[in-house]
A protein has these predicted regions:
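Gram-negative outer-membrane beta-barrel transporters
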Residues: 98-101, 200-208, 228-263
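Face-selective signature of the C-terminal outer-membrane beta-barrel domain
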Residues: 1-118, 192, 196-204, 253
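Membrane-embedded beta-barrel scaffold of Gram-negative outer-membrane proteins
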Residues: 2-20, 131, 139, 173-228, ...
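Aromatic-acidic/polar surface patches that form glycan- and anion
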Residues: 29, 84, 175, 231-232
Length: 263
């Protein structure tokens, strides 16, 4: 195979508009987002390559929520203005090393400056794959990430509850979530009727939140509290997948998932 270097530029524009009415709850949301990505891919050898790039994102949100619950005694009519504009620029690098179909490792890092939060973020990530045998594959990955939440659209179902929606500290509300995800999977291919016609895989991932946005529906019977928390919070996810193709054009799938969360 020929080793080549590539230079690419990608621009993407997204427009989203939503008007939702749940009884006396009126939500209006509008988003315009522009993303530009300049990427250079260089092959050192057939086994190793490096991707470097720069990225810029412009996001304009126009959001509002009128929360009226006159049937709840002493409840206030609330109006929330979530308008904001986010500008973010950053750079990234990703190194890949592979030994044919036997082993591969990917290590990446990126740094981004977000003008809305006036913060610089560093987010490392890594992925490893090892084909232990032709029919057994082990994968592992880890990565740190940040996410600017849209608290109403992320929890749109709360508008249908008829309850008062309260953000206790609206001016100090931190919508930026930070989390670390670590996990892996083990996949085994085997034969039941014919060779390699079945696959069994086991996945485990843990997400540790360092700041999370919570829609608390348990604190009060007539209110939903929206707030951010930097307390211990995590999610453990276990999943088993089974697939089998006993005959051509017939596929059988079965999945079991167990999730354990603490907030």
């Amino acid at each position: 195979d020929e080793m080549r270097s590539n230079l690419a530029f990608v621009a993407d524009f997204d427009h989203f508009n939503e008007n939702a009415y749940f009884g006396l709850n009126d939500y209006k949301g509008n988003e315009n987002a522009l993303a530009m990505n300049l990427m250079y891919n260089h092959y050192f050898t057939y086994r190793s390559s490096l991707i470097v790039g720069a990225q810029a994102q412009l996001q304009y949100y126009r959001e509002s929520l009128a929360n009226n619950t006159p049937w709840i005694e002493a409840a206030k009519s609330r109006f929330y203005d979530f308008d904001r504009s986010e500008q973010e620029v950053g750079a990234y690098a990703e190194y890949t090393y592979a030994v044919k179909d036997k082993f591969s490792i990917v290590a990446g890092i990126r740094g981004d400056y977000n003008a809305f939060y006036d913060k610089f973020f560093v987010t490392p990530r890594g992925h490893i794959r090892w084909n232990i045998t032709p029919s057994t594959t082990l994968r592992g990955s880890a990565g740190l990430g940040y996410r600017s939440t849209n608290v109403i659209t992320d929890n749109i179902g709360i508008l249908a509850t008829g309850r008062e929606i309260v953000i206790p500290d609206f001016d100090g509300f931190n919508r930026l979530e930070k989390a670390l995800t670590v996990g892996g999977s083990l996949t085994q291919t085997f034969g039941l009727v014919s060779a390699d016609d079945a696959t069994l895989s086991f996945d485990y991932f843990r997400t540790q939140f360092y700041n999370s946005v919570i829609a608390d529906q348990e604190m009060y019977a007539d209110k939903i509290m929206l707030y951010n928390s930097d307390k211990r919070s995590y999610t453990d996810t276990y999943q088993i997948d089974f697939s089998w193709t006993p005959v051509e054009r017939l596929d059988i799938f079965a999945t079991f998932r167990y999730t354990n969360s603490e907030m």
